[in-house]
């Protein structure tokens, strides 16, 4: 039991040390500035992110608790439960931002996406019975880099785009 407690203490200390690492400027609250990308695929539309607008094309759910940092950005609206494919090509070096249901975020983290500490500036919800939380993740891309955006869960993975593509 003593060894287990020592191990648990080391894990907690390591976790605290990792969490204490400061985020880079583009990941700090209010600093969500997506790189310009060319986006292709199927099963999505490009719409403007606003609170109380329809979140998914096949359901009446609306976005709620939309942080100011993403209000007015464009995004890929999915059907919800559909099978969209999303491919992007960076027009410039920068960060690509996506949002997934919180229950899916670790799947993207394993694929190289940055997961900032969730807070109210990088999370939002839609008004289903569970008030499902969406978490924003990011990834650095170089100019000309191409990327297939993995679609996860019922919500899919939405891509946040600059308001002036």
Would you name each region that the model predicts?
Residues 1-9:
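Bacterial N-terminal signal peptides that target proteins for export
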